[in-house]
């Protein structure tokens, strides 16, 4: 019959083995990898090992890897008025729309086949154009005109058919109907760059030189906020692009960060940094698209 001492020894040994077995997978799970598209002073795709697998010779502001493998890019000041191009992996241009004002700063491929873009200039506007270049939607934007460059950034078409537009110098994010009527807006503490409408109806906003990210509810109340005050490492350095991942984490750019500095970082809801990206390029990352996590492709509509 087992003695009390032998039973205690068996239980202790079992507990130690269980602890070792359970901690090993946790350590392995802690390692996060991503592949992603980068837009900015340099344009490229990085794999999970940090190697460049594709690049484009021009600077860009916004971009998407499309389901067909092509890349949609915004060339801010190309052709004098900016442009949007879709290119194949070997650099062939299969679509181009040339802007008519000062800059084109954002673009989005829509489910109906159209391309949405914004023009900055004396008459700031949001457009939808067909693949043959015909303008089918023209939304005038109520934005300041003193500084064309600081009018708008990452505008996105929403599932309800409206458009969410961050207006930098105006310090406001507005939701426009196709007829130009503003149906929702929220003032921001600093220049808003990225505004992402989440599935729960909240809106995630990166505030560039304010070095903070906020999430607001439908009433415009802040329900989540992170800034350099939350991190000893002070990772925020011009929070431009952002993306909410399926696991609830948020990836944020540090656009002013140059070579050797943290250019992207991923934070959890409870404000833990779980992944960072650094490279030796001088150019900062303006925006990005996370393509996969630990080899698994991001499914559904990218929240960026």
Where are these regions (language model features)?
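N-terminal secretory signal peptides that target proteins for export/translocation
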Residues: 1-5
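Histidine-/acidic-rich catalytic cores in large beta-rich domains
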Residues: 27-304
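Bacterial N-terminal signal peptides
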Residues: 9-21
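Sec/Tat signal peptide C-region and signal peptidase I cleavage site
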Residues: 22-26
């Amino acid at each position: 019959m087992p003695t009390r001492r032998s039973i205690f020894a068996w239980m202790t040994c079992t507990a130690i083995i269980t602890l070792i077995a359970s901690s090993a997978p946790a350590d392995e799970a802690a390692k996060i990898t991503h592949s992603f598209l980068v837009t900015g002073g340099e344009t490229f795709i990085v794999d999970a090992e940090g190697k460049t697998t594709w690049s484009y010779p021009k600077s860009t502001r916004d971009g998407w890897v499309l389901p067909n493998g092509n890349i949609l890019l915004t060339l801010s000041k190309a052709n004098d008025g900016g442009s949007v191009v879709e290119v194949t992996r070997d650099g062939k241009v299969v679509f181009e729309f040339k802007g008519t004002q000062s800059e084109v700063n954002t673009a989005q491929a829509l489910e109906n086949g159209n391309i949405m873009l914004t023009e900055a200039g004396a008459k700031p506007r949001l457009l939808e154009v067909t693949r043959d270049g015909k303008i089918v939607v023209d939304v005038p934007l109520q934005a300041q005109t003193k500084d064309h460059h600081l009018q708008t950034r990452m505008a996105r078409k929403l599932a309800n058919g409206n458009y969410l537009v961050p207006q930098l110098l105006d310090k406001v994010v507005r939701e426009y109907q196709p007829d130009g009527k503003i149906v929702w807006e929220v003032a921001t503490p600093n220049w808003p760059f990225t505004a992402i409408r989440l599935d729960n109806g909240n809106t995630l906003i990166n505030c560039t030189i304010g070095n903070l990210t906020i999430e607001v509810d439908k009433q415009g109340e802040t329900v989540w906020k992170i800034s350099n005050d939350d991190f000893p490492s002070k990772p925020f350095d011009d929070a431009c692009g952002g993306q909410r991942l399926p696991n609830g984490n948020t990836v944020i750019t540090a656009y002013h960060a140059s070579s050797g500095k943290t250019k992207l970082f991923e934070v959890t809801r409870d404000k833990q940094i779980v992944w960072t990206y650094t490279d030796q390029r001088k150019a900062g990352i303006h925006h990005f698209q996370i393509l996969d996590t630990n080899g698994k492709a991001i499914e559904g509509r990218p929240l960026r």
